[in-house]
Design a protein with these regions (language model features):
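Single conserved hydrophobic/aromatic residue that forms the stacking wall/gate
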Residues: 160-170
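Short, solvent-exposed loop/turn motifs
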Residues: 2, 19-20
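The AdoMet/dcAdoMet-binding core of the Class I SAM-like
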Residues: 21-159
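N-terminal auxiliary segments of SAM/dcSAM-dependent transferases
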Residues: 1-8
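A structure-centric signal for secondary-structure junctions around beta-strands
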Residues: 9-10, 44
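Short polybasic amphipathic segments
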Residues: 10-16
Length: 170
């Protein structure tokens, strides 16, 4: 886990040498991500966030006045580092009364969640193939905990694969 200051994008979170989020444009991603689900179903009683360690999706759910937010995050260190160095993104979402953090493997944790619990589920995992396959493998579990007419919004990899970076900043 690294926070690097990039000239064009400001501070950015890197995990395993891959950029995850940058201060300069994060709000566009998180706002669009949350609002795209709300455009399909405006119910905001209860949301689940799978991943999203930078806190941007949690911040947007809070700003949209969700009643309750269960945030399933594998690594509390990612959240802590982002709270410390990218505090404008998450705005200390973990400290809000409406947010309950569940640390560990999200897909193991949701096995104990009752059916039809969430109005919205936001799957905000890394872009790597492992996370994409993991989310796809567990889609039926996500559907089980989703209320009727609920919406799953998922971050998916671009259709365009870029094999080599043009420039690496360290």
């Amino acid at each position: 886990i690294e926070i690097l200051d990039l000239e064009q994008f400001g501070k950015a979170l890197f995990i395993d040498n891959e950029i995850q989020v940058a201060e300069s444009d994060e709000h566009l991603y998180s706002s669009t991500f949350v609002n795209s689900g709300l455009n399909l179903n405006s119910n905001k009683e209860k949301a689940a966030i799978i991943g999203g360690g930078d806190g941007g999706v949690a911040r947007e759910c809070i700003s949209q006045n969700f009643g309750f937010i269960d945030w399933y995050e594998l690594d509390p260190e990612v959240v802590d580092v982002c709270d410390k160095h990218l505090s404008k993104i998450g705005e200390k979402a973990t400290e809000k009364n409406s947010v309950k953090c569940v640390w560990g493997d999200a897909f193991e944790s949701i096995k104990s969640v009752k059916d039809n619990t969430y109005d919205q589920i936001f799957v905000d995992l890394n872009d790597d193939q492992f996370c994409i396959d993991l989310a796809a493998k567990n889609m039926s579990s996500l559907e089980r905990i989703l209320k009727p007419k609920g919406v799953i919004t998922a971050q998916v990899l671009s259709l365009i694969h870029i094999s080599e970076p043009t420039r690496r900043y360290r």
